[in-house]
């Protein structure tokens, strides 16, 4: 469902017809013969853009908007769900892993500088010159990124594999500064309160 909501297409409905009987084809494509439409090596079930309605484009065409635009955290889980675990349920991500990846992905979202862009936002692509995948606009200007670390012992720091994109009026929450606090359905109202925000003022970044 996460793949479908974010990309507006089904991860298994590609161009491959497994049987001339529609009912049998549906059964095979969703079961025994199920194959991820963006599988990196098996292209059997690739989407055929020429068969799509105009209303399904560009979202329906993975060559235009590949699942990698969802960022590294979700990309990793999509691989486990639709490649490693498609026919091996034990290899699929847990609900907690999906929740954690969604939170981390939200913190990688940055605004598109094109006022006419229909998407308005996109996930940082981890390059020095990020470009909006929806309208093609390259980001101009400073783009600070916070990398989070924790100290398992005095003087020792380890990466949390967690980053926060900084943009004007970006908000800092307690779970960004305290790894014992998580952003989920159990987060208390007190922990949901912002603890700071970033502003670009007089050509400088400040944290209030």
Question: Over which residues does each language-model region extend?
Answer:
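Terminal C-lobe "cap" of eukaryotic-type protein kinase domains
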Residues: 74-109
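Conserved C-lobe activation region of Hanks-type protein kinase-like domains
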Residues: 2-75
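Forkhead-associated
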Residues: 165-208
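Short Cys/His-rich micro-motifs in 6-15 aa windows
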Residues: 134-146
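Anionic-ligand-binding alpha/beta catalytic cores of soluble enzymes and soluble regulatory domains
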Residues: 144-158
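Cys/His-rich microdomains that often coordinate metals
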Residues: 116-126, 139-142
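Short cysteine-rich clusters marking metal-coordination/redox-active sites
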Residues: 112-117, 129-135
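Short Lys/Arg-enriched alpha/beta "domain-start" segment
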Residues: 160-162
């Amino acid at each position: 469902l996460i793949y479908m909501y974010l990309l507006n297409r089904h991860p298994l409905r590609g161009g491959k017809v497994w049987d001339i009987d529609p009912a049998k084809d549906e059964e095979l494509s969703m079961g025994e013969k199920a194959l991820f439409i963006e599988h990196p090596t098996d292209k059997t079930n690739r989407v055929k853009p020429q068969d799509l309605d105009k209303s399904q484009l560009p979202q329906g065409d993975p060559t235009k908007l590949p699942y990698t635009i969802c960022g590294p955290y979700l990309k990793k889980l999509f691989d486990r769900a639709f490649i490693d675990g498609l026919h091996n349920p034990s290899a699929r991500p847990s609900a907690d892993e999906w929740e954690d990846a969604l939170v981390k992905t939200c913190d990688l979202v940055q605004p598109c500088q094109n006022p006419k862009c229909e998407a308005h936002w996109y996930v940082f692509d981890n390059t020095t010159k990020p470009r909006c995948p929806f309208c093609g606009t390259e980001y101009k200007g400073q783009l600070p990124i916070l990398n989070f670390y924790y100290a398992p012992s005095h003087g020792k720091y380890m990466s949390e594999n967690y980053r926060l994109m900084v943009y004007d009026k970006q908000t800092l929450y307690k779970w960004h500064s305290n790894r014992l606090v998580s952003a989920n359905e159990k987060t208390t109202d007190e922990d949901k309160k912002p603890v700071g925000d970033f502003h670009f003022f007089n050509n400088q970044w400040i944290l209030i």
